[in-house]
Amino acid sequence: MSIILGIDPGSRITGYGVIRQQGRQLEYIGSGCIRTAVDDLPTRLKLVYAGVSEIITQFNPDCFAIEQVFMAKNADSALKLGQARGAAIVAAVNRDLPVFEYAARQIKQTVVGNGGAEKAQVQHMVRSLLKLPANPQADAADALAVAITHCHVSQNALRISSGRLNLARGRLR
């Protein structure tokens, strides 16, 4: 059994999602958003760091998974996103959590089955996979999708390393 904290980083809104993995079962623990309403970037980064640190204290996760930076059309936005990621990662590393990073396309492919999925599709699948009563907020759903992706990737890595990977008719079982 392990508790995974997933993060969807942003300099204005950082989503977080916490799930518990027990074998192949996933259980929703909590999710939400860290909102930074101030204008100056250094203060926003401080708030991201403090918010992620508080979430780590509250939920005591075993590992930390975060979305990688994608190349945005706006270079300034990509740089700010990278800095917000850095603030979140430092919060995890300061608590000795292992950090795992996943590309947005990999996350969408894992959760929806389509690497080019829309946000609404991710929300719907997160709701379905975690048996939630309603769709979570978009940024929280993205963070939960990061955590779900980590569960699937780590589960498959465990199956491969333990020799429990069975191939039949070209499909994984």
Swiss-Prot record:
Catalytic residues as annotated in Swiss-Prot or TrEMBL: 8, 67, 139
SUPFAM superfamilies per record: Ribonuclease H-like
Reported cofactor(s): Mg(2+)
Cofactor stoichiometry and binding remark: Binds 2 Mg(2+) ion per subunit.
Coiled coil: none
InterPro entries referenced in this protein's UniProt entry, alphabetically: RNaseH-like_sf (IPR012337), RNaseH_sf (IPR036397), X-over_junc_endoDNase_Mg_BS (IPR020563), X-over_junc_endoDNase_RuvC (IPR002176)
Main EC class the enzyme belongs to: hydrolase
EC number: 3.1.21.10
Annotated GO biological process: DNA recombination; DNA repair
Subcellular location: Cytoplasm
Reaction equation(s) it catalyzes: Endonucleolytic cleavage at a junction such as a reciprocal single-stranded crossover between two homologous DNA duplexes (Holliday junction)
Binding site for Mg(2+) 1: 8, 139
GO molecular function, one term: crossover junction DNA endonuclease activity
Entry keyword annotation includes Cytoplasm: yes
Main subcellular location: cytoplasm
Keywords from the named record: Cytoplasm, DNA damage, DNA recombination, DNA repair, DNA-binding, Endonuclease, Hydrolase, Magnesium, Metal-binding, Nuclease
One Pfam family it belongs to: RuvC
CC per GO annotation: cytoplasm; Holliday junction resolvase complex
Keyword Zinc: no
Family from the record: Belongs to the RuvC family.
Function (record text): The RuvA-RuvB-RuvC complex processes Holliday junction (HJ) DNA during genetic recombination and DNA repair. Endonuclease that resolves HJ intermediates. Cleaves cruciform DNA by making single-stranded nicks across the HJ at symmetrical positions within the homologous arms, yielding a 5'-phosphate and a 3'-hydroxyl group; requires a central core of homology in the junction. The consensus cleavage sequence is 5'-(A/T)TT(C/G)-3'. Cleavage occurs on the 3'-side of the TT dinucleotide at the point of strand exchange.
Subunit structure: Homodimer which binds Holliday junction (HJ) DNA. The HJ becomes 2-fold symmetrical on binding to RuvC with unstacked arms; it has a different conformation from HJ DNA in complex with RuvA. In the full resolvosome a probable DNA-RuvA(4)-RuvB(12)-RuvC(2) complex forms which resolves the HJ.
Annotated protein name in UniProt: Crossover junction endodeoxyribonuclease RuvC
Species this protein is from: Edwardsiella ictaluri (strain 93-146)
Taxonomic path: Bacteria, Pseudomonadati, Pseudomonadota, Gammaproteobacteria, Enterobacterales
Gene this protein is translated from: ruvC
